[in-house]
Curated annotation (Swiss-Prot):
GO CC field: endoplasmic reticulum; membrane
MF (Gene Ontology): aromatase activity; heme binding; iron ion binding
Originating organism: Oryzias latipes (Japanese rice fish)
Protein known as: Aromatase
UniProt cross-references to InterPro entries, sorted A to Z: Cyt_P450 (IPR001128), Cyt_P450_CS (IPR017972), Cyt_P450_E_grp-I (IPR002401), Cyt_P450_sf (IPR036396), Cytochrome_P450_Monoox (IPR050196)
Membrane topology, from the record: Peripheral membrane protein
């Protein structure tokens, strides 16, 4: 899809100098005798200036050729057609770890070099993201919420509410909520032979999010259907051109899908508001309650409250739950790792319920989770925009340049001893943060990174201490059809529902061999 950069073949200044100088073996001889000495000196001076200029030019960034505008068009079409993640991997594999492409006519850099990625993540010049304003407006994210809010001042203000809810004292209750919710959903399984694992994990995670951050009764399956449609709309409209939104008949279906979830969340927020008004005493001020108070004090609009609750609710079902799904597949593909993990769980947790103090002791589990996030992450890139001119690894970056940080590829190319293998040896030693960025770092790092680790550990321990999870024959990570647009997702079709299911076989503590599903 990319053009051979033949259109870029122009004579460089150094070539011009070489041609001028090579007219004769001695530059003071060989010129026509009629040319005065002053003219000869001027020619030599120009040649020297051209040589200096050619060596002081900024580094050129590799990438597809511009070629009369066809290069930007073709690279943009690749992103639209194959997805952001897939296209980013394609260009890094083809051109290297720093690549220049175009998205919707805007210059975009794709970075998978650790030093460049670290520079962008830590630098406040890149606290904004890029995306279609009309697309973000369609899903309610334009200058609202936290995920793609590019109003930096408002984003900083809103982030404080998320930080309070996702860190500190609120983390203490997370383990108990996760264990209770996971156990409840395990007890409610109608069959252990054909478990819809993705559905089980999504329902569990939505329930946990509701208990921690909202606190009102919800229909989990109905809400999950709306979340799925919203996510599909999100990745469909994020980088679409403005002309796409000129024709309502084209994007109306996606706009309706986004509105359905927004209306559902608004209804839940209103229910929470009424409960607060009717309560004699408010013992538990959770995330949604804090936002409602902020709205009452004029600090946040009703639309922002709705969007913040929406983003808190959707953050886990299509990221954390799918991460857990990938982890279960990798666990069964690496039985020696499963053995280590079960031995650790039985030794540290035993017959008791998981406690907060157990988490730090589960070192094998932590290495396993980190290796899964490195080897096959759900979200393997992040999007930024340069707010000021800058230099990244010697390359000049102009204000307004789009940046894609391809951390998934970075994790496979630098530092790790067995970068292309799934191995816990990759985390035997402490890994410098700049080489391992599953949640990002710096001012715009994932605010939920700590609670995400607690949730994953709690769910895995509760599940694996009771059941051996057995994917059906042929279900492996390599054979699993996947897409990679905003995130890596398994392709789900109704006719393939059984193929994605697994069998849960009861296990006894202290017995570490997987029982046969037959």
């Amino acid at each position: 899809m990319d053009l051979i950069p033949a259109c870029d073949r122009t004579m460089s200044s150094s070539c011009l100098v070489a041609e001028l100088v090579s007219i004769a073996p001695n530059t003071t001889v060989g010129l026509p005798s009629g040319i005065p000495m002053a003219t000869r000196s001027l020619i030599l001076l120009v040649c020297l200036l051209l040589m200096v200029w050619s060596h002081s030019e900024k580094k050129t960034i590799p990438g597809p050729s511009f070629c009369l505008g066809l290069g930007p068009l073709m690279s943009y079409l690749r992103f639209i057609w194959t997805g952001i993640g897939t296209a980013s991997n394609y260009y890094n594999n083809k051109y290297g770890d720093i690549v220049r492409v175009w998205i919707n006519g805007e210059e975009t850099l794709i970075l998978s070099r650790a030093s460049a990625v670290h520079h962008v993540l830590k630098n406040r010049k890149y606290t904004s993201r890029f995306g279609s304003k009309q697309g973000l407006s369609c899903i309610g994210m334009n200058e609202k919420g936290i995920i793609f809010n590019n109003n930096v001042a408002l984003w900083k203000k809103i982030r404080t509410y998320f930080t309070k809810a996702l860190t500190g004292p609120n983390l203490q209750q997370t383990v108990e909520v996760c264990v209770t919710s996971t156990q409840t959903h395990l007890d409610n399984l109608s069959s252990l032979s054909y478990v819809d694992v993705l559905g089980f994990l999504r329902c569990t995670v939505v329930d946990i999010s509701n208990r921690l951050f909202l606190g009102v009764p919800v229909d989990e399956k109905e809400l999950l259907q709306k979340i799925h449609k919203y996510f599909d709309t999100w990745q469909t409209v994020l980088i679409k051109p403005d002309i796409y939104f000129k024709f309502s008949w084209i994007h109306q279906r996606h706009k309706t899908a986004a509105q359905e979830l927004q209306d559902a969340i608004e209804s839940l927020v209103e229910r929470k508001r009424k409960e607060m008004e009717q309560a004699e005493k408010l013992d538990n001020i959770n995330f949604t309650a804090e936002l409602i108070f902020a709205q009452g004090h004029g600090e946040l609009s009703a639309e922002n409250v709705r969007q913040c609750v929406l983003e808190m609710v959707i953050a886990a079902p299509d990221t954390l739950s799918i991460s857990l799904f990938f982890m279960l597949l990798l666990l069964k593909q690496n039985p020696h790792v499963e053995l280590q993990l079960l031995q650790e769980i039985d030794t540290i947790v035993g017959d008791s319920q998981l406690q907060n103090q157990d988490l730090q002791k589960l070192q094998v589990l932590e290495s396993f989770i980190n290796e899964c996030l490195r080897f096959h992450p759900v979200v393997d890139f992040t999007m930024r925009r340069a707010l000021f001119d800058d230099i990244i690894d010697g390359h000049r970056v102009q204000k307004g340049t789009n940046i894609i940080l391809n951390t998934g590829r970075m994790h496979r190319t630098e530092f790790f001893h067995k970068a292309n293998e799934f191995s816990l040896e990759n985390f035997q030693k402490n890994t410098p943060r700049r080489y391992f960025q599953p949640f990002g770092s710096g001012p715009r790092a994932c605010v939920g990174r700590h609670i995400a680790m607690v949730m994953m550990k709690s769910i895995l321990v509760t599940l694996l201490s009771q059941y051996s999870v057995c994917p059906h024959e042929g279900l492996t990570l390599d054979c699993l059809p996947q897409t990679n647009n905003l995130s890596q997702q398994p392709v789900e079709h109704h006719q393939e529902a059984d193929h994605l299911s697994m069998t849960f076989l009861p296990r006894q503590r202290g017995i570490w061999e997987s029982p046969s599903p037959f």
